[in-house]
């Protein structure tokens, strides 16, 4: 129910100054009743996505093509309900400004920013959805992670792929590059890759989360 605060515990967008978690704030709280939940923000997401059901997996902040900040949300699933959906690789976002109280204020409507189709790439053998995106400030590029969890016969098949593109190509809507091994083979994660972090100029950290099998 997009008019209810019942899902606040599962659908918060929070912000706090680095190293000061005691100053946490809810982003875009509902102004109608003063409840500290992100109902207003969820309604903006639903309007941008255009579907009653969606799953957000990925959050990044990048410089916009206008010189200010652009906050990005990765969409993994969208459809009518949790059991009637399609996997997508879609990114929506909006430019923002910081308020005097160190919160985020959107200065434009949330809208489609980027999308791509892994099925167009040789070596991608599974339908997958977006599971993470992360900005690399050292090299001005964006990493995207897609993952899959399916069955072939009676056997469960899980894994993921890593993609990269420059910030300029991202703003231009160009296709990402599929990351490969040095010998040209597609890099396919052996577990369900669900998160990525840029540690420094040369290292990435990938998080696995196998929903159906917790044995790594």
What are these regions (language model features)?
Residues 1-216:
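Sequence/structural signature of beta-propeller domains
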């Amino acid at each position: 129910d997009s008019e209810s605060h019942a899902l606040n515990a599962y659908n918060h967008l929070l912000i706090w100054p680095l190293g000061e978690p005691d100053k946490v704030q809810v982003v875009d709280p509902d102004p109608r009743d003063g409840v500290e939940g992100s109902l207003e923000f969820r309604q903006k997401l639903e309007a941008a996505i255009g579907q009653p059901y969606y799953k957000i997996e990925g959050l990044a902040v990048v410089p916009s093509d206008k010189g200010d900040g652009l906050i990005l949300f990765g969409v993994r699933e969208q459809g009518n309900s949790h059991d009637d959906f399609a996997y997508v690789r879609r990114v929506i976002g909006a430019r923002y400004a910081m308020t005097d109280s160190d919160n985020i204020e959107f200065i434009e409507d949330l809208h489609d920013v980027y999308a791509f189709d892994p099925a167009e790439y040789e070596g991608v053998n599974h339908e997958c959805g977006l599971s993470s995106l992360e900005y690399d400030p050292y090299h001005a590029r964006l990493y995207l992670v897609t993952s899959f969890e399916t069955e072939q016969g009676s056997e469960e098949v899980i894994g993921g792929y890593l993609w990269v593109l420059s910030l300029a190509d991202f703003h231009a809507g160009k296709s990402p590059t599929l990351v490969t091994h040095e010998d040209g083979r597609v890099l396919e994660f052996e577990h369900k890759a669900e998160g990525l972090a840029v540690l420094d100029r040369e290292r990435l950290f990938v998080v696995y989360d196998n929903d159906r099998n917790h044995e790594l």
